[in-house]
Amino acid sequence: CITYGSQCFREHNDLGFGIIGYEDALRVSSNTFFYQVGYGVGVDEIHKVSRKLGFNSLSGIEISEQENIGLVASSEWAKEGRGWGQPGRTPWVPEDIASMSIGQFVVQVTPIQIARAYAAIANGGYLVTPYLVKKDEENLSDKKLIKIDIDSNNIQLIKSGLRKVVESGTGVSINYGVSNLPPVSGKTGTAEDGEGGLDHAWFVCFTPSEK
């Protein structure tokens, strides 16, 4: 396990995966890999990039008055009281960054936010403003596209890792019993509900993988 603050953070399989790179870390959903990445870049860098991908903000859909902006925490948020405490009494602690790095505890996102972020990875770096339609539409106005300042090599690396998730990783079961399935890229997500509780899980994907 890896210790941050007073807590020991383990791999979800209790054994670890040895030395792996980014793509395989996505494929096997390695917690300890991303603990180290998150701790290395820091909370405020994670917060900054998350804003680029549409988190911590409304999506722009026509029913935005019913949206929740969610939460991707920052050191300033902790310093100001975490939304419930007194300013200066709830500073950022090392345990926060570990949990944040795998999307837990101080991270709360909505389905439409995660869909926008994955769409931006799929389309090469454009954040799309979703809107409601009555029928299929072929054209998308440029006004609904925002180019994100993210290195194209990093986008390709993420796409490759997401494809591996479905080919041989935690999302491989999507292939079972389905014929003529186009290439799918995606990622599992799991949140625990206390000791003994059932996990909450979802799977986010896009297809075809290379278009």
What are these regions (language model features)?
Residues 1-211:
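Beta-lactam-recognizing serine transpeptidase/beta-lactamase-like catalytic domain environment
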